[in-house]
């Protein structure tokens, strides 16, 4: 599964140990991580992570 929001791509995987879906925004120098209890929550948290990343770039 690949996530895309506003041109940013994100990974998606499942962490058996923590029983969570996890991912990070791809193609950027910073590590932007997100997680969710299910794929719907993962997608929502990915979009929020991208929005926060975009906002942080405006202030720097």
Regions from the PLM with identified roles:
Residues 20-29:
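Positively charged, aromatic-enriched nucleic acid-contacting surfaces
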Residues 1-13, 18, 32-33, 40, ...:
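Short, charged, surface-exposed hinge/linker loops at domain edges
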């Amino acid at each position: 599964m690949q996530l895309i929001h506003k041109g940013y791509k994100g990974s998606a995987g499942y962490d058996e140990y923590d029983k969570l879906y996890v991912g990070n925004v791809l193609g950027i120098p910073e590590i932007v991580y997100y997680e969710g209890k299910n794929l719907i929550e993962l997608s929502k948290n990915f979009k929020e992570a991208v929005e926060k990343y975009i906002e942080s770039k405006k202030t720097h």
